[in-house]
A protein has these predicted regions:
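Catalytic domains of carbohydrate-active enzymes, especially glycoside hydrolases
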Residues: 88-113
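N-terminal secretory signal peptides and thylakoid transit peptides that target proteins
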Residues: 6-27
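Aromatic-lined substrate-binding rim segments of carbohydrate-active enzymes
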Residues: 110-158, 252-261
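Substrate-binding cleft of secreted/luminal carbohydrate-active enzymes
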Residues: 304-326, 349-424
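Polysaccharide-binding and catalytic clefts of secreted carbohydrate-active enzymes
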Residues: 85, 150, 180-305, 315-318
Length: 425
């Protein structure tokens, strides 16, 4: 990318930031326009509950309001031509804007492949049905154009290690999939295939992929999800651990993951210091530390030249009063968010919260009596937003787009959208 093009993107990012800050105090003309547009609620005709949340008089300044757009959403989009994909992308961005969101997190590397032109990874099978096949246009470029035209930021969501989640996803791997070109970098877990976090060359390749994205596209940031070590099985990296001379497997694995995340962060900042790099870990801090091997204390507290992330967005997909079969309420929404907020954190590191829109009408599986009913009010997500704002959280993200706009629970989803729109207006 030329310096001239980089400068143009930098100026455009400043413009978007000013636009988004403006959303914090009042509804822009563009947002008003989109709110007046009808949003299809799906084919089900059940009446929607009336949202109980009153409009918020003033949005928190700088609040991050995001939605995850996963490979599941892309699987339902029309890639038959650039025009068809652009129409779907435009509708998606319109819907995001109508909710008062300001950030779209688009999963552009779900299986060691790419929804963009890459010299490192094959085209995603989501584009044509065949991994490695060029769709004839650049989906990420289209997404960026449509997002930025509406003042929305777009962060490129990268799954760093996963190449395959099962024998059929993706159905057939391209010849230049890393599973084929570098099988020595890969570990298999059940039917899945993952880059081995203990192999430095594999981590370096992931970082090169991050650099390629931020150098070639006007993304507003890079976003990693919670897929780090795929298993606690000591056999997957036994040879590397033995060669390391270290005594503590858990600590060594945390170092491996942190080395990758730190390098990805630094690659983003080297391309443009104004870009953001964030990670969405599991909501259970114990699982993060001891199963995913994420060193939360380091990630949250490191700053300056030692910074590892710009933000963390733990996935808090439990409702109020969520109760385990043991009787523990540690993971109840009100308790686990307070636990995260109490963790030591550098002033420069933001803390956001991922929330489970997919729980709407279904529930969270808790042992508490209202584990389903509280997700059937039409204002479950808005209630959480209100409480997060009161607690001082910096923002939130919704998993996932389809749960609000393509849900089988169309009546409830419509009510949840209305409640969120009222809060974000």
């Amino acid at each position: 990318m030329t310096q001239r093009r980089r400068n143009r993107h930098r100026k455009r990012r400043v413009g978007r930031r000013a636009f988004l800050i403006g959303l914090g105090g009042s509804v822009s003309a563009a947002l008003t326009y989109y709110l007046l547009r009808s949003i299809p609620a799906g084919n089900n005709a059940e009446p929607a509950p009336s949202p109980q949340t009153a409009p918020n008089p003033a949005l928190p300044s700088g609040e991050w309001r995001a939605v995850w757009v996963s490979y599941l959403e892309f699987a339902e989009m029309d890639f038959s031509s650039e025009a068809a994909f652009r129409a779907d992308a435009a509708a998606l961005m319109d819907n995001c804007l109508s909710l008062g969101l300001n950030t779209v997190i688009a999963q552009v590397r779900p299986f060691g492949d790419a929804l963009y032109r890459s010299s490192l990874f094959p085209w995603s099978h989501l584009c044509t049905g065949v991994q490695g096949q060029d769709p004839g246009f650049d989906p990420l470029d289209v997404l960026l154009t449509e997002a930025h035209a509406r003042g929305l930021s777009l962060e490129a969501w990268v799954n760093p290690y996963r190449l395959r989640s099962s024998a059929s996803m993706p159905p057939v791997l391209a010849e230049n999939s890393l599973l084929n070109t570098h099988p020595e970098w890969v570990c298999t877990v059940n039917e899945g295939a993952y880059l081995n976090p203990a192999i430095p060359e594999a981590a370096d390749y992931v970082v090169q992929g991050v650099a390629e994205l931020v150098q070639n596209y006007a993304v507003d940031g890079i976003h990693f999800d919670d897929y780090f070590y795929p298993t606690t099985d000591p056999s997957i990296d036994a040879a590397q651990f033995a060669a390391s001379g270290e005594a503590d497997l858990t600590a060594w694995r945390r170092t491996n993951v942190t080395r990758l995340v730190k390098a990805a962060h630094d690659a983003v900042k080297a391309a443009d210091p104004t870009l953001r790099f964030g990670v969405s870990p599991q909501g259970n801090p114990d699982n993060d530390r001891n199963e995913q091997y994420t060193d939360l204390s380091v990630w949250l507290t490191a700053s300056g030249a030692d910074a590892v992330v710009d933000y963390l967005c733990p996935q808090i997909y439990w409702g109020y009063g969520y109760t385990l079969s043991s009787g523990s309420t540690r993971f109840a929404f009100e308790n686990i968010t307070a636990e995260w907020l109490a963790l030591p954190r550098a002033e420069s590191t933001a803390l956001y919260f991922g929330r489970g829109a997919y729980r709407i009408g279904v529930g969270d599986g808790g042992a508490n009596a209202d584990s389903v009913s509280q997700w059937c009010t039409g204002s479950a997500l808005a209630r959480q937003v209100t409480d997060l704002r009161s607690a001082g959280a910096g923002g939130w993200a919704l998993y996932r787009y389809g749960s609000l706009f393509r849900s089988d629970e169309s009546g409830l989803a419509a009510a949840e959208r209305a409640a969120l729109t009222a809060l974000n207006g």
